[in-house]
Design a protein with these regions (language model features):
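C-terminal accessory region of SF2 helicases/translocases
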Residues: 1-77
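Mid-to-C-terminal oligomerization/interaction "stalk" domains of large proteins
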Residues: 2-31, 95-206
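Short, surface-exposed, charged/polar-biased interaction segments
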Residues: 42, 49, 64, 189, ...
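C-terminal helical accessory/scaffold domains
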Residues: 56-120
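Intrinsically disordered, low-complexity mixed-charge segments
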Residues: 206-214
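Non-Sec secretion/translocation targeting segments of pathogen effectors
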Residues: 214-220
Length: 220
C-alpha cells in the first residue's frame, strides 16, 4: 500500500509537470502566431518612421546651428528666444485645451501643441512619420533647446528600436524551436502510470480475496 501511495504521488507530480509544459506550449504557439509578429510589425514601422523623420530633419535643418529659422503661426523667426516666446504666446491663446493645435513648423516637421490636464503642462509634438513629444516649460529659450534635444535624440531611439526588433526576432526563432520539444519526462510518466495501474489491479485482487463470503442460513 505504501508503494502504491508513493507511486501515486510521483504520477500526480509528473502529470502536473506535463500540464505546465502543455500550457507553456500553448503560450509559445500564441506568441509565434500573434504576439511576436505583431511586435515585429510595430517595431519595423517605428524604425521606418525614425529613419524617415531623421532624413527629413537632415534635409531641412541647416548644418550651421546658428542659422536658425522657425515658423510660428504665420511668422518666420530667425531668433531662437523670439521664436520660443511666440510659442508660449500661442499656447496661452489656444481656444481649446483639449485638442491638439498646429502652431508652426521646424526642420520639416509640424509643431503641434496640446495641454496635459493631468500634469498641468503644455506638450509639444514634432510630427513627421512619428510624433516626438516633449513638455514645454516657461522659459522661451529653454523650449528651443528641448526641441533640439528631441531631434538629436532620434538616433538613440532608432538604435533602441533596432535592438528591440533583433531581440523579438530572436525570441520568435527560439520559441519555434522550443515548441517542438516534447515533455521531457513523458517516458517516466508512462512507465509509472503502468506500474500504478498494475499495483491497483493487485490491490483490488487482494481485497476481493480477503472479503468473507456470508452464506444464508437455512430457513426452518
Amino acid at each position: 500500500i505504501k508503494e502504491n501511495m508513493d507511486l501515486d504521488i510521483q504520477v500526480s507530480r509528473l502529470k502536473l509537470m506535463k500540464a505546465n509544459h502543455t500550457s507553456q506550449i500553448y503560450r509559445l504557439e500564441d506568441n509565434i502566431a500573434k504576439n511576436y509578429p505583431k511586435q515585429i510589425e510595430i517595431l519595423q514601422e517605428r524604425i521606418q518612421g525614425f529613419q524617415t523623420d531623421m532624413e527629413t530633419v537632415r534635409k531641412n535643418l541647416p548644418a550651421d546651428k546658428d542659422n536658425f529659422s522657425m515658423k510660428v503661426g504665420n511668422r518666420i523667426f530667425i531668433d531662437k528666444k523670439e521664436a520660443g516666446t511666440a510659442i508660449l504666446v500661442m499656447c496661452q491663446e489656444m481656444d481649446s485645451l483639449q485638442q491638439m493645435v498646429e502652431i508652426g513648423e521646424y526642420a520639416g516637421m509640424k509643431m503641434k501643441v496640446t495641454f496635459d490636464s493631468f500634469n498641468r503642462k503644455f506638450v509639444m509634438s514634432l510630427k513627421g512619420e512619428l510624433s516626438h513629444n516633449f513638455e514645454l516649460g516657461s522659459d522661451a529659450f529653454g523650449n528651443i533647446t528641448r526641441l533640439h534635444n528631441v531631434l538629436d535624440g532620434m538616433a538613440g531611439k532608432l538604435s533602441e528600436a533596432e535592438t528591440k526588433l533583433n531581440n523579438v526576432i530572436h525570441q520568435l526563432e527560439t520559441a519555434k524551436m522550443e515548441v517542438q520539444k516534447p515533455f521531457p519526462e513523458e517516458a517516466e510518466l508512462k512507465e509509472k502510470m503502468e506500474q500504478l495501474a498494475q499495483l491497483d489491479a493487485l490491490l483490488n485482487m487482494d481485497e476481493k480475496a480477503e472479503t468473507p463470503v456470508v452464506e444464508n442460513e437455512p430457513t426452518v
